[in-house]
Amino acid sequence: MQIKIFPLNCLFLTLLLMSQISLAVDAGDQLNQIERSQNKKERLRSPPKIEEEKEPPKLKTQAATFKVSNFSFEGNKLISSNELQVFLKEYLNREITLDELKLAVDSLSVLYKDKGYLATASLPKQDITEGNVKIIIIEAKFGGTQLKLDPNTKYRIHPEIIQKFIEHSNQKGEVLNLNALDRAVLIADELPGAAVTQSLQSGTKDGETDSLLNINNEPNYVAMVSVDNYGSHATGPVRYQANASFLSPLGIGDRIDLGLLHSKGTDYARLSFNRPIGYSGLRMGINASALKYDVIAGAALSLNPEGTAETLQMEGNYPVYRSRAFDLSLASFLERKHFRNKAQEAVESNYFIDLFNMGSSLNHKNTLFLAGETSASIDVDLGYANYDDSPLTFQASKIEQATQGRFNRLRWGINNTQFFTDTISSVLKFNGQLSDSNLDSSQKFYLGGANGVRAYPTSEGSGSEGYLFSAELHKELTANFTATGFYDYGFARQYIDNTNNATGAENATGKNSFNMKGYGASLEWIGFVGSYRSTFSAIWSRRIHNNPNPQADGSDSDGSRPGNFYWFKASMSF
């Protein structure tokens, strides 16, 4: 038997190349790239509308006047007489007209509404010549919900289910809480498959108010197909995507989402299901995804790098507060990710990442300038990286780089859209993450790409910590076009602990901390192709200064040396 022995320099070169592959292109990086594009928030395209309560106008009249020295109240339980007296103090001990007195009485209903209640105030027949005025207050009670249904319509969600959402936090015969009622209606309206509005009407009993619900069906499904060049050079920049959502197929406010993605070197699929739990607004669900990649370009192509990734996640979401102008939600998920990477058909790595997440998000509409909206989120991740099933050489490298074991991560995102006129708006974004440990590629923060610093390729510039800031100015043009100018800035810190545990040398091959920045412009068209809503966008971007963390030959991680970057995307909705 003949035994062939490779020269040591060839063996060293092969191991070095395989090590570089694991850092540059692997299943964790590819999955992270896809999940980043999926989580992008669509830009607000029109000013948000906020319902504002307007105070009744002050009356000016020359009618006979009289002086009120004291108000007394009857029927008030939710607001004390002292508080009502203070509210009406501007009408005390001065000459007022009868119309002004009526205005004062009517304003009490505004006070109640500001506190989330419905009440009517009236003046009974009385002698007010002594300056004592008695006001009768009727505090509304909830009489229940009434359904306004079309007998010829088969509703996507059983109307009785929607009715239970309203009555869950609004008990019949109890004091009508407008805030609780509004929250329940908004939650019901968010159920997939139904559009819910309400109006208040007099109940069957004196002092009661009913909620009249108007329910309309939404489509059975919504779908979108798209093509873009947002992918990486190594696995094919041109990506084809198809996404479909099936709204309430079980008739209970449930939702099924299916997503598919294909490029020359990548295939990805994701399936999710979620449904309401009870009638408080709590939703829970489960989702799974699978990824397969093959490197089709780049210096490492001869090693035939390939790999897979699978994820399984259980999630929950609860609306803590809902109103027309402000939302606050809590969310949590538990997930497992499994990654396998090969080079020259040999297993390079086989490992798991387990993650427990707790997060909160809010959304606030404002009336600054024309109008605006701010959304923010914060997430805490507790994770564990388990490389025990990987080859010993890979395990050793992860121990040396201190990425094995437990890690904690804090992530945040802030997005503000402000409308100055009907056609001019700005968008400010700031998001990032902090970590207490060196992270695996699947958990890192990436700077480059169409959703990051747009002057750099996808997945360029990654770190265990980092942040991105972008500022955009949008101008609506004629013929459904929008022009945008933007500036992007990103910072990344590759390793929290930059000292190799085995050698004492630095883990980072270049700079451990660096920033990337660029500017550019885009043009977007939104309209209809036939009866299908469609979009097309083109982005041009140019970097400010050179790549701060280039390859040895001065190129980007994908081998390119672009002076300008161009991104394209086209989509069609069904």
Which positions does each model-derived feature cover?
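Periplasmic polypeptide-binding modules associated with outer-membrane biogenesis and secretion
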Residues: A24-G231, G259-Y268, L410, K429-G432
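Repeated loop/turn-to-beta-strand initiation elements of outer-membrane beta-barrel proteins
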Residues: V196, Y221-A223, L250-I256, Y279-G285, ...
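Residues that define the transmembrane beta-barrel architecture of outer-membrane proteins
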Residues: G207, G236-Y240, G265-A269, T308-L312, ...
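Membrane-embedded beta-strands of outer-membrane beta-barrel proteins
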Residues: S211, A242-A244, L271-F273, M314, ...
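Transmembrane beta-strand segments that form the barrel wall of outer-membrane beta-barrel proteins
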Residues: Y221-G231, A242-S248, I252-K264, L271, ...
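Outer-membrane beta-barrel proteins
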Residues: G231, F246-L250, S272-Y279, E315-S323, ...
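Transmembrane beta-strand segments of outer-membrane beta-barrel domains in Gram-negative
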Residues: R283-S437, Y495, N515, D556-S557
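C-terminal transmembrane beta-barrel domains of outer membrane proteins
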Residues: K398-F574
